[in-house]
Amino acid sequence: MNNTIQEVSVDLHDWRDEQEAWNNRSKFFVELHNRADRKAQVTDFLSFLKDEYLLPPDGGTALDIGCGVGDYALGLAREGYKTTGIDLSDGMIHGAKQLADKEGFDVNLYIAPWSEETRQRLGWDKTFDLVYSIFCPIMFDVDNIRAMHNASYDTCLWIAFSERKDETVDMLSEHFFGRDSFPWASKVKACLDAIHEIGHNVKVTYKTVPETEVMSLDKAVDYFTMRLHNNGWGIMEDMKREIRQLIEPRAIDGEIHNKTVDTVAWVSWSVK
């Protein structure tokens, strides 16, 4: 095995708080890796690539932008592809290395925020057969979509939320930070406009995914704190106590039932 980690020499000054926030979530995502629902998501991803003829040629290369702990990169590695992952969070990247080492697959790993500067610094000019990004917040920036396109030799896949409804997170987020004003529709439209401008054979598929998450009160407190806490808010334990007070009245027999409905855009295109 040759699971290397390289920290890219780019300025992280403006990214430190976000990096730490994702680092604090990395343990959760390592534990999520072997859960049945995560395995099903990876299987669905691979099936989509196969059905849409997006898989690299045998032994080909793939880049995962915002790879997290490498769930999807490892899924491709199991199929015999040479995979690379890049993520802002060093905690996530070290989690990816831990999982890759355990499973016996090679994944090249890089720590950096994705940008055109990062792409150029790494010399990734039409380097990978497939470049993809899954639920990576930074990819709502059109310039980062263009950088993704420039890193690909053949095809790209961008998977992103176009609408999110999360009963408990929405309530807690409004309590702590005010009503969510993220312009999902306009952000997705701007990215789609850019993709139609630069790409060929663009295909957009929307999937609506309803789900009810059931967890104990203690696990729910930890989970929603992990989802919401950032350094700008304050002390994590203070948020935990407040979250417990807010969600405990919603518990049914000691469990929290959280209903979510996500609308997800699967956008594929060819670069040539």
Residue ranges and their predicted role:
Residues 1-57, 59-68, 157-182:
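Conserved class I S-adenosyl-L-methionine
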Residues 71-117:
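Class I SAM-dependent methyltransferase SAM/SAH-binding core
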Residues 142-157:
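A short glycine-rich, Lys/Arg-flanked "PGG" loop and its adjoining helix->strand segment in the class I
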Residues 203-272:
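Conserved Class I S-adenosyl-L-methionine
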Residues 128-143:
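A short SAM/SAH-binding and catalytic strip from SAM-dependent methyltransferases
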Residues 184-199:
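Short alpha-helix
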